[in-house]
Amino acid sequence: MSAISSLRMHYRLFGVPGILKRATAGIKGGYPELLAKLPNRQGAVYVRIHTTDVLVFEHVFVGGGYDFPLEFRPKVIVDIGANIGLASVLFATRYPDARIISIEPEPSNFAVLAMNAKLFPQIEPVHAAVSNQSDVAYIDPEIPYGHCGVQISRKPENGVSVRCLTVSDLIDGFNLPRIDIMKIDAEGAECEILENASAWMDNVKLICAELHERFRPGCHEAFARATVGFLRGWRYDELCCADRTVAEV
């Protein structure tokens, strides 16, 4: 994206404050945070100017990235791969009575997630990765995806350590007898997350996952296998959703 296009996007999304922050970032470097007003006028969120946070903000709040049809009022939402928490914030404004567990492994992303969680108290930030084993994982610096995401490795020599949880760990640790919405955006780790889904999928009402087949072949197959028996499913680009209920019982 050219500098002019970037400035136009910052102005369109964030107004004059966005332009000023973007100009400051261009002169001084770094990624200054901006408290950006939400398009729905239901609060504000922190985003890092001159990063992919801006594109994610547009995707979530302007582009309708998570505007999937829902026939019930969710009480518990689990956001795996929450990044800085923009999808969690969208859910918080849309379902203010819901409890939202937001998990993010990358330290700088998690720091902004924690800031946003303070603005929306129903969001509970968790600094961890999610996979098929309870263990320690490592953020691999050799496979960067900007600020959008990271690649998790089991090799100690590859980067910063982070605790690794399974979905069953989350269910037990946070006392979640039911998960109404599970959102997964894990840069290819969907395969591992969904590997033992039979142990917990009965607890999930609706699951939506960004399937990064280009990073990890087999993600679509893993999702299809894990959601056998769901009553309906749909897809928007990389986002695949499956819902086991058509109407609230």
Residue ranges and their predicted role:
Residues 1-249:
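Phosphate/nucleotide-binding beta-alpha loop and adjacent structural elements of enzyme active sites
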